[in-house]
Amino acid sequence: MKKIVVILLSALACCTMFIGCSNSSANQEQHLSVYSFSGEDEQFAISNGVIVLNSTEETFYGGDLKEKQDKLSDIAAYTKTFYVMSGNEKKILMSFVVEDMTGGTVNISGDIGKISGDIMTKIGTDELQNNLFFELKTTDLNGEENEFQLQLTVTEVTEKADN
């Protein structure tokens, strides 16, 4: 009888230790937020932009840029920048430069690209609404520079779960 009690107490102690090692559903649950954005003016339109945020990764998809008029056909270089205005401060989320070194032109339309990493560390998600902008700076073959800014409409796609 003493052996059975010792075995049962040992088994109970082992089970108690291993219960703390299991992954609870609360620990496995990750917060996921998905935002879409778009915008347009008389020169160009941006569609299909997406921001994906979870506890392990932040990804910013710039979407597609479509030129609405063919006024920007002699572009030799451009800079595309997404940023959030926070007060008077411009917080850049993604920016890149393209320049043709052969004397030809580059096309501004098409896929804008994506970036992953700590994109949103400087801003809060509440700052995205009404504060996300796209800036296009171009230089044509004659060296003339132009700058265009577009405020983007941000929509949260995910809904917060009530627990």
PLM-predicted stretches and their roles:
Residues 22-24:
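Bacterial signal peptide processing site
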Residues 34-89:
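Short, surface-exposed binding/anchoring microloops in extracellular/periplasmic proteins
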Residues 90-144:
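Short, solvent-exposed, Trp/other aromatic-anchored flexible loops in extracytoplasmic proteins
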Residues 16-20:
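C-terminal motif of bacterial Sec signal peptides marking the signal peptidase cleavage site
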Residues 10-11:
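Classical Sec-dependent N-terminal signal peptides that target proteins to the secretory pathway
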Residues 62-64, 131-135, 149-151:
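Beta-strand secondary-structure signal
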Residues 1-4:
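Positively charged n-region of N-terminal signal peptides that target proteins for export
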Residues 144-163:
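Short beta-strand elements
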